[in-house]
């Protein structure tokens, strides 16, 4: 991928205390400064497919607090998605992959002491400020299937940020991933999401695996670091089962509250919530609609592609769209039963 700066970090760089104060000028970590300044420089030099300024945003009335944003250019200017036929589809070197990008799109290499590197590159069709792609060991050409390193890097980047608005996510093949080359998304969203504090019940104590009580139901893991090995293994054991059964899925990683049965109204966001949503697969070329149901939409962040849908959207219409992509209740029950037997 060419020469670039290397961002080296240790556990000492993790930010332990984060508070959702609602203020624009929060304290910034070394990671935030590197990402925000590098991303802004790339934007100013015209490397993006369109210029992303402040997006028109509205919070939909209702209990879910959906964050709707109008991002017409992303809907029209982004790279055409690859055709996906299976959650376990092999990497194809003939297709676009992140070894083929313009070297100027590379922000820096992320490297934990004495461990493997992860390339941090700009998403040239950004959905929000700071939108980047985390690509673990791109030269190894991993397909879009989560690995231990990918999950660990995702959690650690959230811990490296002092901004509770920094989010990380993953779309599996069949879950609206656009490129079959292992990558995660990272971006800043300066709005609180219900998912940060929504209630959850414990379903598998040996894995500290919880289930979200509210719509859309998904599996929840929680960690405050720095010892991440157990939670990373638990997450991978779940996603491995989904891949083995060809079940598409989306992940969302965000600062959040410890899981409990009652919603947490405090502003403390010291840990990381990792939510895994098994979902119906969408194979073949992507369908175009008001919005694709993927990692950020399931978390309550809705980038709309056209003004008409943006202005007419209600909590009810959004839930109806999302519901169509969730596993039916019977399949969800069968999956939970299988997980309890094999994990």
Swiss-Prot record:
One of the record's GO molecular function terms? GDP-D-glucose phosphorylase activity
Alphabetical UniProt keywords: Cytoplasm, Guanine-nucleotide releasing factor, Hydrolase, Nucleotide-binding, Nucleotidyltransferase, Transferase
Entries under InterPro entries matching the protein:
GDPGP (IPR026506)
Q: Where is the active site?
A: 183 (tele-gmp-histidine intermediate)
Compartment(s) where it occurs, according to its Swiss-Prot or TrEMBL record: Cytoplasm
Out of the domains of life, which is the source? Eukaryota
Q: Which biological processes are named by the entry's GO terms? A: glucose metabolic process
* Swiss-Prot/TrEMBL catalytic activity: GDP-alpha-D-glucose + phosphate = alpha-D-glucose 1-phosphate + GDP + H(+)
EC number from the UniProt entry: 2.7.7.78
Q: Provide the Gene Ontology terms for cellular component.
A: cytoplasm
Q: Where is the signal peptide?
A: none
Q: What class of enzyme is it?
A: transferase
Function of this protein? Specific and highly efficient GDP-D-glucose phosphorylase regulating the levels of GDP-D-glucose in cells.
Per the record, the similarity remark reads: Belongs to the GDPGP1 family.
Other remarks in the entry: The orthologs in A.thaliana are GDP-L-galactose phosphorylases catalyzing the first reaction of the Smirnoff-Wheeler pathway, the major route to ascorbate biosynthesis in plants.
Q: What is this protein called?
A: GDP-D-glucose phosphorylase 1
Q: Which gene encodes it?
A: gdpgp1
């Amino acid at each position: 991928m060419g020469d670039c700066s290397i961002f080296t970090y240790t556990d000492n760089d993790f930010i332990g205390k984060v508070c959702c104060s609602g203020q624009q000028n929060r304290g910034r970590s070394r990671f935030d400064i590197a990402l925000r300044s590098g991303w802004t420089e790339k934007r100013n030099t015209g490397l993006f497919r369109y210029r992303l300024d402040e997006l028109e945003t509205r919070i939909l009335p209702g209990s879910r607090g959906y964050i709707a944003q109008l991002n017409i250019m992303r809907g029209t200017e982004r790279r055409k998605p690859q055709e996906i036929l299976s959650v376990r589809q092999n990497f194809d070197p003939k297709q676009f992959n992140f070894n083929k990008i313009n070297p100027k799109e590379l922000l820096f290499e992320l490297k934990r002491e004495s461990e493997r590197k992860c390339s941090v590159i700009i998403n040239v069709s950004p959905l929000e400020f700071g939108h980047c792609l985390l690509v673990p060991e791109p030269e190894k050409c991993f397909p879009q299937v989560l690995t231990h390193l990918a999950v660990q890097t995702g959690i650690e980047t959230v811990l490296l940020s002092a901004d509770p608005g920094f989010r990380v996510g993953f779309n599996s093949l069949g879950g609206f991933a656009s490129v079959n080359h292992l990558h995660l998304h990272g971006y800043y969203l300066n709005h609180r999401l219900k998912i940060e504090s929504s209630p959850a019940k414990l379903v598998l104590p040996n894995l500290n695996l919880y289930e979200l009580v509210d719509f859309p139901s998904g599996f929840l893991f929680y960690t405050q670091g720095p010892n991440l090995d157990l939670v990373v293994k638990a997450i991978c054991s779940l996603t491995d089962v989904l891949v083995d059964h060809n079940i598409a899925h989306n992940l969302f990683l965000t600062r959040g509250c410890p899981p409990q049965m009652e919603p947490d109204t405090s502003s403390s966001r010291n840990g990381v919530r990792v939510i895994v949503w098994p979902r119906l697969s969408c194979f073949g070329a992507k369908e175009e609609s008001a919005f694709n149901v993927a990692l950020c939409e399931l978390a309550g962040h809705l980038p709309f592609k056209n003004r008409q849908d943006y202005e007419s959207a209600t909590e009810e219409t959004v839930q109806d769209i999302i519901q169509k992509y969730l596993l039916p209740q019977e399949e969800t029950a069968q999956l939970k039963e299988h997980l309890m037997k094999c994990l």
